[in-house]
């Protein structure tokens, strides 16, 4: 049988990915609180973004279901927000967000990907220069690519290079937009947002876009993220975050000026041309966010746990740039990283390998993603497993 010529490219790509140890498949697993069941094994889930442990908190969910009003018990908005999908609970959540962050307005979206892929094309035209950290998330990269702006990627966390680029280019463009994450999703390090805000304020045509996806809920006295922690909530033009991680829900948000809110409603394609979030999910997000400042004990516990695990990774001899609850164990080669992940799973820890193109070549890693719900005894066992000599052959890791 002659192979269809039209499929050869895809087949060759998959074979190449398999040879390089980078072929992905969708994992099948059963969830039970902080535990994962897979292939007959019960493993501690150290790969989840449920940073505060709210997604596995059945008591909290039952409290919500008892209290949610009938008007919000809708499983679909059935329309774009600009048609018939703009429910009262959407507006209430946005008012709550704006009030907590001390900003004029907030706007919510169906996902963090929609958020990052939509704002930059809406606000960055051909007279705009975007200065983006080298390691920003794929959704931000795609948003930059869809925009008409010119883009320069500055070296990761290199403030001096960024400062030099702003000084060099600010007069040549109508607008410069600095784009960064606050807690970086793969290294777990933290951006100097206060310094970036001061740099922005020195130039009237410079704006600051910050993605707090991995920080909101977890960092800051009230759980409002690194911007709260560093005292610059009011200085960030586009302060973005997600509901799908620490807040245990779905969707995303930006807090901004009223002018920018109204502009995005009129020009942001990923808001205009998509179905709004279901009212029931929005009601859950509102329920969770309204209680966020009361979970400081969970944030403290998570920070303490992360410090222990970071110490274990460093004592085991692995590079670890983390300053947060995201703790990378950088192995290097993809095949060795897959083997290391298998070893950790054999020891009872559900940890997955992260490989190119998610991370640069030669930096494949295990990404330990910690949550406040992990039992103390299991965290101690995780520390011991990280520090223990490998049970694989010398050539395996």
Predicted regions, residues:
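Conserved PLP-anchoring active-site segment centered on the Schiff-base-forming lysine
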Residues: 119-138, 159
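PLP-dependent enzyme catalytic core of the Aspartate aminotransferase-like
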Residues: 54, 58, 66, 95, ...
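Active-site PLP attachment segment
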Residues: 222, 228-263
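N-terminal "arm"/small-domain region of PLP-dependent enzymes with the aminotransferase-like
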Residues: 9-75, 206
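Active-site phosphate-binding strand-loop segment of PLP-dependent enzymes
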Residues: 50, 152, 156-210
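Structural motif of enzymes handling amino- and sulfur-group chemistry
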Residues: 276-295, 301, 305, 314
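Conserved N-terminal alpha-helix of the aminotransferase class I/II PLP-enzyme fold
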Residues: 62-112
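Conserved PLP-binding catalytic core of the aspartate aminotransferase-like
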Residues: 300-307, 314-348, 363, 370-372
């Amino acid at each position: 049988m002659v192979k269809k010529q039209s499929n050869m490219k895809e087949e060759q790509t998959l074979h190449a990915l398999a040879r390089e140890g980078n072929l992905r498949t969708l994992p099948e697993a059963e969830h039970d609180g902080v535990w994962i069941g897979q292939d007959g094994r019960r493993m501690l889930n150290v790969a989840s973004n449920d940073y505060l442990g709210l997604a596995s908190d059945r008591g909290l969910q039952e409290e919500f279901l008892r209290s949610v009003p009938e008007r919000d018990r809708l499983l679909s908005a059935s329309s774009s927000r600009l048609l018939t999908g703009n429910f009262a609970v959407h507006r209430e959540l946005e008012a709550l967000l704006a009030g907590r962050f001390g900003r004029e307005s907030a706007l919510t979206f169906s996902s963090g990907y929609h958020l990052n892929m939509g704002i930059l094309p809406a606000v960055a035209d051909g007279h705009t220069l975007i200065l983006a950290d080298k390691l920003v998330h794929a959704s931000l990269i795609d948003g930059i690519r869809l925009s008409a702006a010119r883009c320069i990627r500055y070296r990761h966390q290199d403030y001096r290079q960024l400062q030099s680029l702003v000084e060099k280019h600010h007069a040549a463009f109508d607008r410069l937009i600095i784009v960064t994450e606050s807690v970086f999703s793969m290294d777990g390090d933290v951006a100097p947002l206060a310094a970036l805000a001061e740099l922005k304020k020195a130039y009237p045509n410079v704006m600051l876009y910050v993605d707090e996806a991995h920080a909101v809920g977890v960092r800051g006295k009230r759980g409002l993220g690194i911007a709260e922690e560093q005292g610059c909530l009011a200085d960030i033009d586009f302060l973005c975050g997600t509901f799908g991680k620490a807040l245990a829900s779905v969707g995303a948000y930006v807090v901004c000026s009223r002018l920018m809110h109204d502009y995005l409603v009129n020009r942001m394609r990923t808001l205009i041309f998509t179905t709004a979030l279901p009212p029931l999910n929005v009601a859950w997000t509102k329920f969770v966010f309204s209680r966020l400042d009361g979970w400081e004990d969970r944030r403290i516990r998570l920070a303490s746990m992360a410090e222990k695990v970071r110490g274990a990774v460093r004592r085991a001899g692995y590079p670890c740039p983390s300053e947060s609850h995201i703790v990378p164990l950088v192995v290097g080669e993809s095949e060795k990283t897959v083997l290391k992940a298998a070893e950790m799973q054999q020891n009872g820890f559900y940890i997955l390998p992260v490989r190119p193109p998610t991370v640069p070549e030669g930096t494949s890693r295990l990404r330990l993603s910690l949550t406040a719900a992990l039992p103390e005894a299991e965290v101690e066992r995780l520390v011991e497993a990280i520090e223990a000599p490998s049970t694989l052959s010398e050539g395996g890791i």
